[in-house]
């Protein structure tokens, strides 16, 4: 029986810190059997992964899926380039945006959706150090405001 819902395999936690997310896409991914088995064990790393558009196809590079422990000589290469499956209009949109410059394709997460592996791919723009500091200061200020409001509601002040 196929599993329903969404089971997250891996997330790229630094992506939202290092990039400003402009647009998000859901893409399928072409895998071999031992890769899927390794992903079912929850083993994958999106840390250095990025996507490129070559000849009208989107490729995910530097994604690390370790070899399946029970695999034999049929095992896969852990860091091989994998094809992402998107609609033609989405690919054309991504080609236009990435050619403008300063924009890149970054995987945010990888998950099972109804038994199929999907990648949440983001069109993103790199952040400068001062942008990261501004975001940190803004989040800290918001946290202080919500904490103070919570105290006032509870009658602590």
UniProtKB/Swiss-Prot annotation:
Gene Ontology CC: cytosol
PROSITE patterns attached to this UniProt entry: SSRP
One GO process term, biological-process aspect: trans-translation
Cell compartment(s), UniProt: Cytoplasm
Record-linked InterPro entries: SmpB, SsrA-bd_prot, SsrA-bd_prot_CS
Transmembrane segments: none
MF GO annotations: RNA binding
Assigned keywords, A-Z: Cytoplasm, RNA-binding
Main location: cytoplasm
UniProt record similarity statement: Belongs to the SmpB family.
Chain's role: Required for rescue of stalled ribosomes mediated by trans-translation. Binds to transfer-messenger RNA (tmRNA), required for stable association of tmRNA with ribosomes. tmRNA and SmpB together mimic tRNA shape, replacing the anticodon stem-loop with SmpB. tmRNA is encoded by the ssrA gene; the 2 termini fold to resemble tRNA(Ala) and it encodes a 'tag peptide', a short internal open reading frame. During trans-translation Ala-aminoacylated tmRNA acts like a tRNA, entering the A-site of stalled ribosomes, displacing the stalled mRNA.
Protein name: SsrA-binding protein
Organism of origin: Rhodococcus jostii (strain RHA1)
Biological classification of the source: Bacteria, Bacillati, Actinomycetota, Actinomycetes, Mycobacteriales
């Amino acid at each position: 029986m196929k599993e329903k819902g969404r089971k997250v395999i891996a997330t790229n936690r630094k992506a939202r810190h290092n990039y400003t997310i402009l647009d998000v896409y859901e893409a399928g991914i072409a895998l071999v059997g031992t890769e899927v088995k390794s992903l079912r064990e929850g083993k994958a790393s999106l840390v250095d992964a990025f996507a490129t558009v070559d000849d009208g196809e989107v490729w995910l590079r530097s994604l690390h899926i370790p070899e399946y422990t029970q695999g034999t000589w049929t095992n896969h290469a852990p860091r091989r380039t994998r094809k992402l499956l998107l609609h033609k209009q989405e690919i054309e949109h991504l080609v236009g945006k990435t050619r403008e410059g300063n924009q890149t394709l970054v995987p945010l997460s990888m998950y099972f959706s109804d038994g199929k592996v999907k990648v949440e791919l983001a069109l993103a723009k790199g952040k400068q150090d001062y942008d990261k500091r501004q975001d940190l200061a803004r989040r800290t200020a918001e946290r202080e405001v919500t904490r103070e409001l919570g105290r006032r509601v509870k009658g602590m002040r």
